[in-house]
């Protein structure tokens, strides 16, 4: 098991101070006060940072200098998800703003391919439009 500690931790219900996550493989085994962390557990201390679950954004037009309408490709999508991940957003729905059927189809293919490859963080596709009045 490994511990990740931070000055502030949000457990989904409350803000906790001086607590840690106890992680077993890919799963959170416990949230506990620092004093209760097993002494043999390797610990990553995030210092004065805040530890919280990853955020989900269901309408993402772009990120990392890429607008999904302009670059609805696998590479564009990878740049967007990577940019959002840096700021705590772990899952997104890339959005195509009202555009042509060809752009919408290309975007749908990029999202479908990313999901088929098991790329983390792409929940689906948000299509707007096809037209705004």
Residue positions per predicted region:
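Short amphipathic alpha-helices and their capping/turn segments at secondary-structure boundaries
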Residues: 39-42, 46-49, 107-119
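Hydrophobic pocket-lining residues within nucleotide cofactor-binding pockets
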Residues: 9, 51, 68, 96, ...
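Histidine-rich, glycine-flanked metal-binding segment
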Residues: 2-3, 9-53
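Short, glycine/charged-enriched secondary-structure capping and boundary segments
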Residues: 18, 71-73, 107-109
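Divalent metal-dependent hydrolysis catalytic cores, especially in the metallo-beta-lactamase
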Residues: 61-63, 78-110, 120-133
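Acidic/polar N-terminal loop/beta-strand segments that form early-domain functional surfaces
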Residues: 24, 34, 61, 71, ...
């Amino acid at each position: 098991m490994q511990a990740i500690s931070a000055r502030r931790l949000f457990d989904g219900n409350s803000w906790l101070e001086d607590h840690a996550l106890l992680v077993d493989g890919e799963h959170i085994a416990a949230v506990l006060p620092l004093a209760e962390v097993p002494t043999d557990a390797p610990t990553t201390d995030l210092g004065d940072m805040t530890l919280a679950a990853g955020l989900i954004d269901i309408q993402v037009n772009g990120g990392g200098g890429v607008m999904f309408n302009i670059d609805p490709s696998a590479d564009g999508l990878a740049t967007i998800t990577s940019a959002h991940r840096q700021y705590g957003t772990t899952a997104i729905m890339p959005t195509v703003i009202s555009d042509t059927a060809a752009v919408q189809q290309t975007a749908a293919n990029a999202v479908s391919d990313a999901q088929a490859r098991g790329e983390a963080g792409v929940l689906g596709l948000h299509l707007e439009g096809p037209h705004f009045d």
